[in-house]
Amino acid sequence: MAENRYELNKNLAQMLKGGVIMDVQNPEQARIAEAAGAAAVMALERIPADIRAVGGVSRMSDPKMIKEIQGAVSIPVMAKVRIGHFVEAQILEAIEIDYIDESEVLSPADNRFHVDKKEFQVPFVCGAKDLGEALRRIAEGASMIRTKGEPGTGDIVQAVRHMRMMSQEIRRIQNLREDELYVAAKDLQVPVELVQYVHKNGKLPVVNFAAGGIATPADAALMMQLGAEGVFVGSGIFKSGDPIKRASAIVKAVTNYQNPQILAKISEDLGEAMVGINENEIQILMAERGK
């Protein structure tokens, strides 16, 4: 039964392919995201840029606020829990959230263990910066993977690094002989069946999105051309000068990511992008959480 549920969850996540998932803080923003063509919204009280600016401990959002967003839109609603905080996950499941993001954006609740995602009916999204992290999260029951990037910076460089790293490691696994896959599985600390899947199919067993630092239509198209199957946009939309226009442009960029003419047209006159922070100017806080 649990196995059937996991297959169903993976298929649910497949339905988001080619889509944009936007961080929203209230019903009004959620409606803007839905009108712009978002595939889903991520309900959270403080977007990554604010979490980074304020510091301190960041936790799961207020269930009342999440329910207000659920009531405002007809597209799927996601919400974040702290790494390893299975009770926050139980609460989100109780309010019938569509997806749970076990997220490094929030302060980790457990430095060693992630949530046992197989104990839940709801599909989980998890971040990964390389193939090992991705397969370990999938082994725990994640139905969807995203790059970690460095959230709240508006700097795409980390997301690019993570996506390229994932692609390189997948190609390396594909080039191994069958009998070498057992050693690869041991090195990655994952079940050999997952490594065999990557070897045979040249991709992860679940959908792989890009996240962290996506601020422009060009950023979104870049991640798609690098192999992402969709994108998460956090601070990039509602920290910009014209959120409605930018949200719509990023959705169009993901659909038309291989068409420079369309990308040029939709990139015009979007107002100020969010103020970015260069990765060399900050301490990398979030990408290193949860290995």
From Swiss-Prot:
KW Lyase (keyword) present: yes
SUPFAM superfamilies xrefs: Ribulose-phoshate binding barrel (SSF51366)
Any one biological process term the GO annotation gives: amino acid metabolic process
Residues annotated as catalytic: 80
Pathway: Cofactor biosynthesis; pyridoxal 5'-phosphate biosynthesis
One Pfam family cited in the UniProt record for this chain: SOR_SNZ
InterPro entries: Aldolase_TIM, PdxS/SNZ, PdxS/SNZ_N, RibuloseP-bd_barrel
Annotated D-glyceraldehyde 3-phosphate binding sites: 164
Residues engaged in binding D-ribose 5-phosphate: 23, 152, 213, 234-235
Subunit details: In the presence of PdxT, forms a dodecamer of heterodimers.
Family to which this protein belongs: Belongs to the PdxS/SNZ family.
Protein name: Pyridoxal 5'-phosphate synthase subunit PdxS
Gene, per the UniProt record: pdxS
